[in-house]
Swiss-Prot record:
Belongs to the methyltransferase superfamily. GO terms for molecular function: carboxyl-O-methyltransferase activity; malonyl-CoA methyltransferase activity; S-adenosylmethionine-dependent methyltransferase activity. NCBIfam families: BioC. Pathway: Cofactor biosynthesis; biotin biosynthesis. PANTHER family: ARGININE-HYDROXYLASE NDUFAF5, MITOCHONDRIAL. Converts the free carboxyl group of a malonyl-thioester to its methyl ester by transfer of a methyl group from S-adenosyl-L-methionine (SAM). It allows to synthesize pimeloyl-ACP via the fatty acid synthetic pathway. It catalyses: malonyl-[ACP] + S-adenosyl-L-methionine = malonyl-[ACP] methyl ester + S-adenosyl-L-homocysteine. This is Malonyl-[acyl-carrier protein] O-methyltransferase. Keywords: Biotin biosynthesis, Methyltransferase, S-adenosyl-L-methionine, Transferase. One of its GO terms (biological process) is methylation.
Length: 275
């Protein structure tokens, strides 16, 4: 199968970490929609917030489009707009192209949120659901969004906040000295980055969603099925042993309120901003 085109305007930031992210999410494409209930819930709320926010866009970007679930909903919400679906994972866009009705009418682009292959002031609306947490530097991603937005353009995004997977983080700390959970942005740091890029009309909200799992292993398997990977420098480089899994499960069970059930917290930050 031929590769999807990479426009030659703007660089694709090709680093080992980014290649790893792209491969991980690409491999998760086939089963992603079956385990992405939280992502859909957050994205639907985000989409509802922009339906009546300003005039309809002429050109819009689904940044971190994944399997294209929200690309299709964006097209339905704004049928006269040109839609670009961009993702760092070529495997995701292959899935989108072959499984999403209307994909032929979208522009599919393999690209990096921190080096968008788009011209300055070329987009009216950027929608990004649960993608920014995988960026190496959030400031570069926000800067790129500001660059490609036209004056008056809107950016709507969601990302995980610092309290995400706090329980899993604490359980692992009781087991070893490695970093097993990614560090996520604080609400304050996100707002500071938006203001630093010149965004003045900012609506930034935070909420915590909690999900129950039959076991710690089930939680880990869901994270893996979503393509989520540990990007920290101090991550373990060895396979998870049964003994270690038992230890982290025991540590999780000792956390307050976890004796009879495994619950995971996901802090979600959502932003609606205008350039």
């Amino acid at each position: 199968m031929n590769s999807l085109p990479r426009p030659d305007i703007g660089p694709f930031a090709d680093t080992p970490e980014k290649r790893w992210v792209g491969v991980s999410f690409g491999a998760a494409a086939v089963g992603y929609d079956g385990v992405a209930a939280l992502q859909r819930e957050v994205g639907e709320s985000l989409l509802a917030g922009i339906r009546h926010l300003g005039p309809p866009p002429a050109r819009m970007l689904d940044l971190g489009a994944g399997t294209g679930h929200f690309s299709g909903l964006l097209v339905a919400a704004f049928p006269t707009a040109e839609c670009l679906a961009l993702d760092i994972a070529e495997g995701m866009l292959r899935f989108l192209r072959s499984h999403r009705p209307g994909a032929d009418g979208m522009g599919l682009v393999v690209g990096d949120a921190e080096a968008l292959p788009l011209a300055d002031e070329s987009v009216d609306l950027i929608f990004s659901n649960m993608a920014f947490q995988w960026c190496e530097r959030l400031d570069r991603a926000i800067s790129e969004c500001c660059r490609v937005l036209r004056p008056g353009g809107r950016l709507a995004f969601s990302t995980f906040g610092e309290a995400t997977l706090a329980e899993l983080r604490m359980a692992w700390r009781a087991v070893d000295g490695y970093t097993h959970v990614n560090a996520f942005a604080t609400r304050r740091s996100v707002e500071q980055e938006l203001r630093a890029q010149g965004f003045t009309k900012i609506r930034l909200d935070a909420r915590t969603l909690r999900r129950g799992y039959p076991s710690v292993l089930a939680l880990m398997k869901e994270l893996k099925a979503l393509g989520a990977r540990n990007l920290t420098r101090n991550r373990p480089r060895h396979l998870l042993s049964r003994h270690t899994l038992e230890r982290v499960s025991e540590a999780y069970g000792r956390l307050p309120g976890m004796a009879s059930a495994v619950t995971a917290s996901f802090e979600v930050l959502t932003a609606l901003v205008e350039k």
